[in-house]
Amino acid sequence: MYMKIRSVFSCLLISAVSMLAARAADQLEGRAVLPAATFAQGPTSGQQLGPNPINGQPVPFLNKQPVQGFSAVQDNGDGTFNVMPDNGFGALENSADFHLRVYHIQPDFKTKDGGSGTISVLGFFELRDPDKRIPFTITEQFTDERILTGADFDIESMQRAADGTLWFGDEFGPFLLHTDASGKVLEAPFHLPDFDNPGKEIRAPQNPFNEEATTVRIMNAARHHARLHGNNKAPVCSPWEVMLDDGNANTFVDNRQAPPVGSGLAPASSEIHNIASIQAAGYPVVTYTVDNTARMTELLTLKINGIISDRSDLLYGAVASYDANADGTPGDYLDADGLIDIAKIDAQGHRGSRDLRPENTLPAMEAGLDNLMTTLETDCGITSDGIPILSHDPHIQAQKCSRTDGVPYEDVAAEVLIKDLTVAEIQEQFRCDKLFRGPTQQNDPALSPVTVDFFGGDASQIYVLPTLQQLFDFVTFYTTYYRTGPGSGHPMATKRWKNAQRVRFNVETKVNPRTDEDPLHPGQIFALRTIEPTPFAQKVANVIVSNGMQERADIQSFDFRTLLVVQEQFPQIRTVYLFGDFPKFDDPAIAGSDDGTNMQPQAGAGPNTPWMAGMFWPYRSTKLTQPFRAQTSGGFEGMAITPDKHRLLPLLEKPLAGDDQRTILMHEFDLASSSYTGNRFKYQFDPRGVSIGDFILTDEEHGLIIERDNTQGNLNGFKAVYKITLGAPGTFVNKELAVDLLRISDPHRISEPGQPGDVGIGRNFAFPFTTIEDVLFFDQKHIGVLNDNNFPFSVGRHVGSGQPDDEEFIIIKLDRPL
């Protein structure tokens, strides 16, 4: 019995050794390398990559596009190949300036018989959407060609159909994208149905049909539009503070959490605008309106760029007491003069300081200046004589203002429109000094000595609605008042004049694009209560320019049409994009109904909001009703096409939420009907695997899949090509190891010479890259493999020098036929 067991053991050992030898005997037959720092013509890219340099590579890439990140390959049958980079730099936030392209390359493989081992780039074409097939906002939204970028799609796979058109698998949706042979989009992207949850879709966190992924897309389009017109100031994103994705369950929009009966609204998450994501994309985040110290401190901790507050006194106190570096000493956001450092936080007095003085009046602005705000936030209307005047509303509101002649002015329905009166008429007939915001709001002229002095001592004038020009004049007057005038002896004089001489302005254009009726003012159409958006923006901007305030004044709006005008005609002025959800209810008589600002579509006027200049906002489609089952970078990574060219089999890179976390899915897509069949196949990871890199079919039922871990430069890592066999739909594919990519024989030393400290070069060749995303089938004994070099981030080969990985294209001769 002992001898029998020993004999069996010996046989098993010999078999195991033979298998290892077979794997190690897979042989490097050819290798070609495209240097990491290879570039093609194109606009500057990599502007959001962060610290410079990265792995020795200077960034950004001025007036050029890197040829890198190959994630799909096609054999043209003539010694050339088409290779497809992915989205560029790995994230939606940092890839808006990376053009989606397909490059035409020709490798001259180094083999035992010779060859240079180089790759020539012969040309490229770009993916583009001139026919506007894509329904959501893209970076080049406002161009004719609409070239697609890595912030629009993360394409990871590519197949050519029988008709010569191209199909791309995307991770952001995940989507299938269909183009002609030149890269022009032919139809809207195809969603992936969630067959486990009928009526739902499989969505990733970057899906543009969820609100959560839309803010950055809109800001990208806004910035690109600005740059087209010479405005190189990054626009500001200004979301409502209760709609920040901050993980605070106590901040939400009431009518999102519990829509009133009769409102016609759907419930939705309020966790929409992610501060870190927006900032990573290159946009300052200034939130409104925050009026308690605890919340201010919370937002400072979240590294917000700016806070707008009705309580300028509390805001200064919160900033002054903030200990950013936790060393026990507050004041980290103050400069040497004790003033707020705007580079660290922009503290804005909302409508001056509306909880301290009547809003949008000079006393309110004086309060904001007294409390050392870095910015005075305000709103403008346009009078009948074309003058910008400070007002949040198109009417002279009865709640805020009274008539100077004593005639009662209480009926909201009878309120006068600003556009129907001249400045002189408004300032002669109305005073806006009513108190309704609580006990901290006061209108005693003694509290506003600078304003009284500005009006020559006539306290009866201080609560007129001032013009924008008067605001600029007042700030200059205030500076002099405390520097050399009556206030120069005040204990705060130095801080006040120093702050006032540099204070900024954030001026809102109060325009409403809706064409339905304002229920508070029967017979009035929202859009007709003010002048048109273009002259509105022009008149505000002209005052800024005439005062030389282009570096100190921003123009903000919920109506993005006005901001596009500013970018086009006044490129020295920075724009601020306001986001909020103040819906008009189906029954506007229900308490809380508002004017539709600025996400809500207008009833009967199409599915999109009229506020965002045609950019798409997926109103109230959030993770509450459409959760994210696909992971970030977990969408379509590999995609096979059947030999008859009838079906695609896109394969998810990572498991879905709610599924077994070692299993990923292939979905079958019928090209004739352009629809998913519902057939799915399961693929199970090796215990070491975390992602797949590519998937192709070699015949009707067999294929190759690259599977990997996340290591780089590690010869003990896991990088493998598996041969798979499809079974019946719904079952696991059978898999067996075809190539261990870290154990390839190089008896002819094709891979040499390398650089000092290179990993995996020489007789024992390896492909030690983080991501390996391309596999080609040549014949039963030969396959091709390419890495995705993640330029300039990954260092898997050149560990010794620390230089970024090159693109490598290898041909492997298999020890055993497929």
PLM regions with names:
Residues 2, 461-464, 731-734:
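Intrinsic-disorder-associated interaction segments
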Residues 10-18:
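Bacterial N-terminal signal peptides
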Residues 206, 212-613, 633:
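Phosphate-group recognition and catalysis centered on beta-loop-alpha active-site segments
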Residues 24-217, 227, 589, 605-818:
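Sequence/structural signature of beta-propeller domains
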Residues 1-10:
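Bacterial N-terminal signal peptides that target proteins for export
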Residues 14, 75, 79, 108-111, ...:
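Short helix-loop boundary/capping segments at the starts of domains
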Residues 8, 21-25:
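Bacterial Sec-dependent N-terminal signal peptides
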